[in-house]
A protein has these predicted regions:
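Non-catalytic helical/linker scaffolds that mediate oligomerization, partner binding
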Residues: 1-290
C-alpha cells in the first residue's frame, strides 16, 4: 500500500485507496493500515475462508469501530444478499445481517456477486436499500461509540466537529453545513455519527464523489464564489430551493480560513435570519478561500 501511495503521490493524484481486509494478517495490522489507507472494506467472504467463521461478526464489529475512531470510511461487503444471486427474495438471516451492519454504524454496504452475475441485480439493490433505510429508522438514537479527543492535540477541526454534533442533541439543529475543499471536516463530522445530516457543499466535484462513502454526509457540488461568506449564503438559498432546508430551520455551520487549513469556527444560525441579514452581516473569515 505504501508503494501505491508513492506512485499516486508522484503523479499528484488524489485517487483514494480502500484497503480490503480479507485475512488474519489484515485484521492484526488494521491500525497500521488505517494510518495509510483512505478507507477499509471488510471482505467477509474471504475472511470466512481465512479465519474461523464464528469470529467474523466480532471482527466485523471491531473493524467498523476502529475505522470510525480513525475517521476513515468503512464498507461492509460480500455475501450480503447471496441468496438473491439465484432467488428473488433474501433469507431472514441476510436481512438481519444487513441491519446489524447498520446498527454497528458502518459507512457503506456493498453488493458483489448479487449484481455482478446474479439473476436479480436490480431487485437486490432495491432490497438492500429498503432494509438499510428501515434499519436507519430502527437503530438506537444513542451512539455507543465514543470518540475521545486527545487533550494534547491541537486538532481544532475534530474539536469543533464534535461540538457541532453535540449541539444537535441540545438545540433544534436540523443539519450541519460545511464548505468542503478536500472533505476533511465532513469526514470528521461523519465520525461522530450524528442524528442529523451533514450537508457538505463541495468546491470540487471529485470531493463530492469521495464523500459519497461517508456516514450521514450529503455532498453537493457548487462552484466557487468570490468569498466564503457569499458561498455560505448561496448554499443556504440553494438548499432552501431544493427543499433540503426550511426557512425556520436552525443549522450549524463549520468552515475554515483558507484552503489546506483546519476548520476554525462554528456558527449556529436560523436560515431565514441568516439570509435576512446577508447583506450587512460579516462572518468570521469572510474573505477566506475555499
Amino acid at each position: 500500500m505504501l508503494d501505491i501511495r508513492e506512485i499516486l503521490d508522484a503523479h499528484n493524484s488524489d485517487i483514494r485507496i480502500i484497503a480490503k481486509i480479507e485475512n488474519q494478517e489484515g485484521v492484526d495490522n488494521i491500525d497500521e493500515i488505517l494510518e495509510v489507507a483512505d478507507g477499509v472494506m471488510v471482505a467477509r467472504g474471504d475472511l470466512g475462508i481465512e479465519v474461523p467463521q464464528e469470529r467474523i461478526p466480532g471482527i466485523q464489529r471491531t473493524l467498523i469501530r476502529k475505522c470510525i475512531l480513525a475517521k476513515k470510511p468503512v464498507i461492509v461487503a460480500t455475501q450480503m444478499l447471496h441468496t438473491m444471486i439465484n432467488n428473488p427474495r433474501p433469507t431472514r438471516a441476510e436481512v438481519t445481517d444487513i441491519a446489524n451492519a447498520i446498527y454497528y454504524r458502518t459507512d457503506a454496504l456493498m453488493l458483489s456477486g448479487e449484481t455482478a452475475y446474479g439473476k436479480y441485480p436490480v431487485e437486490a439493490v432495491k432490497t438492500m436499500t429498503k432494509i438499510a433505510a428501515q434499519a436507519e429508522k430502527d437503530k438506537l438514537e444513542e451512539n455507543d461509540i465514543r470518540i475521545p479527543l486527545d487533550e494534547n492535540s491541537n486538532d481544532v477541526t475534530a474539536f469543533l466537529a464534535k461540538q457541532a454534533v453535540k449541539a444537535t442533541t441540545k438545540l433544534k439543529i436540523r443539519a450541519i453545513i460545511t464548505d468542503s475543499y478536500q472533505g476533511r471536516t465532513a469526514r470528521n463530522l461523519a465520525a461522530f455519527r450524528g442524528k442529523y445530516p451533514v450537508l457538505a457543499i463541495c468546491y470540487k466535484e471529485k470531493t463530492m464523489r469521495h464523500l459519497a462513502l461517508s456516514y450521514g454526509v450529503e455532498a453537493i457540488y457548487m462552484p466557487e464564489l468570490a468569498n466564503g461568506q457569499e458561498y455560505y449564503f448561496a448554499a443556504l438559498r440553494r438548499l432552501l430551493k431544493e427543499g433540503r432546508l426550511h426557512p425556520t430551520d436552525m443549522v450549524g455551520y463549520l468552515s475554515s480560513g483558507k484552503a489546506g487549513t483546519q476548520t476554525s469556527f462554528l456558527e449556529i444560525n436560523v436560515v431565514e435570519d441568516a439570509l435576512k441579514h446577508a447583506g450587512d452581516s460579516v462572518l468570521p473569515n469572510s474573505n477566506r478561500y475555499l
